Amino acid sequence: MAAGGLSRSERKAAERVRRLREEQQRERLRQVSRILRKAATERSAEEGRLLAESEDLVTELQGRSRRREGLKRRQEEVCDDPEELQRKVRELASAVRNAKYLVVYTGAGISTAASIPDYRGPNGVWTLLQKGRSVSAADLSEAEPTLTHMSITRLHEQKLVQHVVSQNCDGLHLRSGLPRSAMSELHGNMYIEVCTACTPNREYVRVFDVTERTALHRHQTGRTCHKCGGQLRDTIVHFGERGTLGQPLNWEAATEAASKADTILCLGSSLKVLKKYPHLWCMTKPPSRRPKLYIVNLQWTPKDDWAALKLHGKCDDVMQLLMDELGLEIPRYSRWQDPIFSLATPLRAGEEGSHSRKSLCRSREEPGPGDRGAPLSSAPILGGWFGRGCTKRTKRKKVT
């Protein structure tokens, strides 16, 4: 035994005492918790004394309860009543008209109307998985740009929106006709694969989801570059990764747009990820010089307290009202005019079997090149960029 130290038996005895005290504390915590769940009128005199003797535990448990309730409220969807929403839209329309440089940030909420589930909403993928429910999604190739996507494109055409920064990988901004120079797809695009061996990187736009075989830190798609023969990779930025590609992420343009913006409109984003990108919020500027923030979302966001206006409504509903207020017609999406068909690089001979995803086609009846008859209806989510997002949560659960 070292001088001044404890013997092995003394250390064991001290450890037993420590564990006993911890167990006694846990039991007392359980007792206090059970008592607090009772109405004050139903508590016995002995229970009242126990609460009085356990002020610290009572304070701790009440704090936990308040935090749980706060988190629950944040997850709830709230809708403004029609009159309130209309009033807010008029205020938003005034901001859009008067903005010198308006940037739009978009999230999964603008694509739910296209049957692409979000992650965090009440019917979102992670929410359902946490409840132990199965998750399915319609074939993503069946998704089409929503009213919100088409409205944003029209606003850009009218020079009311200067740039769009999107978290979505679904390619619907591209397919709505928004110029690629006017958008930054921070987390990639499911229709684009690139050759990083070429300088500058060579892009291949496809008419199918290129992410079928890719995953976190494993981005090769199995196809090769037509010029140098190098392996092609997808452009998706998975949870836990840092995007390094120039396009379609276009971080340089996103950062420049944010620095110029005097107004930012956030549509359908929880902002839980975007808030971590400081360059998008100009927080180094004094408050008076930061862009005014307008948020459209049904749930709480961490930027609500910074917003000049928060609109609780579905994106399509708000954008319909906004476009009416601005006197602008919303263009209809047409598959025949979808830009992806003119941008796409066809597969070479021998590459037709390199994927099993359903290809986009100008007519719904027309089979896409290289198709293997993927189902059109809802099906369990398997692989690809969306499926990988789902497994982020399912892997946390142990299968017994």
UniProtKB/Swiss-Prot annotation:
It is found in: Nucleus, Nucleolus; Nucleus, Nucleoplasm; Chromosome; Cytoplasm. Zn(2+) binds at residues 195, 198, 225, 228. GO terms for cellular component: chromatin; cytoplasm; nucleolus; nucleolus organizer region; nucleoplasm; nucleus; site of double-strand break. Its cofactor is Zn(2+). Residues 1-28, 354-380 are annotated as: Disordered. CDD domains: SIRT7 (cd01410). Belongs to the sirtuin family. Class IV subfamily. NAD-dependent protein-lysine deacylase that can act both as a deacetylase or deacylase (desuccinylase, depropionylase, deglutarylase and dedecanoylase), depending on the context. Specifically mediates deacetylation of histone H3 at 'Lys-18' (H3K18Ac). In contrast to other histone deacetylases, displays strong preference for a specific histone mark, H3K18Ac, directly linked to control of gene expression. H3K18Ac is mainly present around the transcription start site of genes and has been linked to activation of nuclear hormone receptors; SIRT7 thereby acts as a transcription repressor. PROSITE patterns: SIRTUIN. The keyword Transcription regulation applies. This is NAD-dependent protein deacetylase sirtuin-7. It catalyses: N(6)-acetyl-L-lysyl-[protein] + NAD(+) + H2O = 2''-O-acetyl-ADP-D-ribose + nicotinamide + L-lysyl-[protein]; N(6)-glutaryl-L-lysyl-[protein] + NAD(+) + H2O = 2''-O-glutaryl-ADP-D-ribose + nicotinamide + L-lysyl-[protein]; N(6)-succinyl-L-lysyl-[protein] + NAD(+) + H2O = 2''-O-succinyl-ADP-D-ribose + nicotinamide + L-lysyl-[protein]; N(6)-propanoyl-L-lysyl-[protein] + NAD(+) + H2O = 3''-O-propanoyl-ADP-D-ribose + nicotinamide + L-lysyl-[protein]. The modification Asymmetric dimethylarginine is found at residue 388. Its EC number is 2.3.1.286, 2.3.1.-. Residues 82-329 form the Deacetylase sirtuin-type domain. Interacts with UBTF and the RNA polymerase I complex. Interacts with components of the B-WICH complex, such as MYBBP1A, SMARCA5/SNF2H and BAZ1B/WSTF. Interacts with ELK4, leading to stabilization at target promoters for H3K18Ac deacetylation. Interacts with histone H2A and/or histone H2B. Interacts with DNMT1. Interacts with SIRT1. GO terms for biological process: DNA repair; DNA repair-dependent chromatin remodeling; homologous chromosome pairing at meiosis; negative regulation of protein ubiquitination; negative regulation of transcription by RNA polymerase II; osteoblast differentiation; positive regulation of gluconeogenesis; positive regulation of rRNA processing. Its main location: nucleus. PANTHER family: NAD-DEPENDENT PROTEIN DEACETYLASE SIRTUIN-7, NAD-DEPENDENT PROTEIN DEACYLASE SIRTUIN-5, MITOCHONDRIAL-RELATED. The modification Omega-N-methylarginine is found at residue 388. The active site is at residue 187. Residues 8-28 have a biased composition (Basic and acidic residues). Keywords: Chromatin regulator, Chromosome, Cytoplasm, DNA damage, DNA repair, Metal-binding, Methylation, NAD, Nucleus, Phosphoprotein, Repressor, Transcription, Transcription regulation, Transferase, Ubl conjugation, Zinc. GO terms for molecular function: chromatin binding; histone H3K18 deacetylase activity, NAD-dependent; metal ion binding; NAD+ binding; NAD-dependent protein lysine deacetylase activity; NAD-dependent protein-lysine depropionylase activity; protein-glutaryllysine deglutarylase activity; protein-succinyllysine desuccinylase activity. NAD-dependent protein-lysine deacetylase and deacylase activities are activated by nucleic acids. Histone deacetylase activity is activated by DNA. Protein-lysine deacylase activity is activated by RNA. H3K18Ac histone deacetylase activity is inhibited by methylation at Arg-388. H3K18Ac histone deacetylase activity is inhibited by deubiquitination by USP7. Phosphorylated during mitosis.
